[in-house]
């Protein structure tokens, strides 16, 4: 355990303890795939739990914001502040669809998901489990 309150012998350079703590954290994070599987699982679970908790709490705020924005847009359309040219929207959507399909069909799709998942399987497994724990805690 790193003591964050230690000082550098009174020389006025506080923060050596914080520097040591940051170095310790970076040691585990930078080369995480080289660590033991249980360390990878633990780090993934920790980050997943925090992420799941904040996604659940923040998701309510985002949902409320999107809902209120949608209602305000519908009210503005109803009152005539906003007018939609549906034929122009349809034409632009067709052009966008053609453009995307031309770009996608001409290129080979690179599949990196298999190697990524197999390389980081312990971290991803811990993260997924941590997300579920974070969802249940929130």
Swiss-Prot record:
Broadly expressed in somatic tissues. Expressed in the hermaphrodite spermatheca and male gonad. Expressed in spermatids, but not expressed in oocytes. Glycans are attached at residues 85, 111. One of its GO terms (cellular component) is mitochondrial outer membrane. Its main location: mitochondrion. It is a multi-pass membrane protein. Keywords: Autophagy, Glycoprotein, Membrane, Mitochondrion, Mitochondrion outer membrane, Transmembrane, Transmembrane helix. Belongs to the FUN14 family. Mitophagy receptor which plays a role in paternal mitochondria degradation in embryos after the two-cell stage. This is FUN14 domain-containing protein fndc-1. It comes from Caenorhabditis elegans. The gene is fndc-1.
């Amino acid at each position: 355990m790193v003591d964050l309150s230690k000082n550098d012998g009174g020389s006025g350079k506080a923060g050596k303890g914080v520097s040591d703590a940051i170095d310790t954290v970076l040691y585990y994070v930078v080369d995480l795939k080289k660590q033991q599987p249980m360390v990878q699982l633990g780090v993934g679970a920790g980050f997943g739990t925090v992420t799941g908790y904040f996604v659940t709490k923040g998701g309510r705020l985002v949902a409320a914001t999107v809902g209120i924005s949608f209602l305000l847009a519908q009210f503005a359309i109803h009152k005539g502040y906003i007018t939609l040219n549906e034929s122009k929207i349809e034409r632009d959507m067709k052009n966008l669809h053609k453009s995307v399909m031309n770009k996608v069909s001409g290129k080979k799709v690179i599949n990196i998901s298999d190697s990524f998942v197999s390389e980081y399987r312990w971290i991803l497994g811990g993260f997924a489990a941590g997300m579920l724990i974070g969802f249940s805690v929130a």
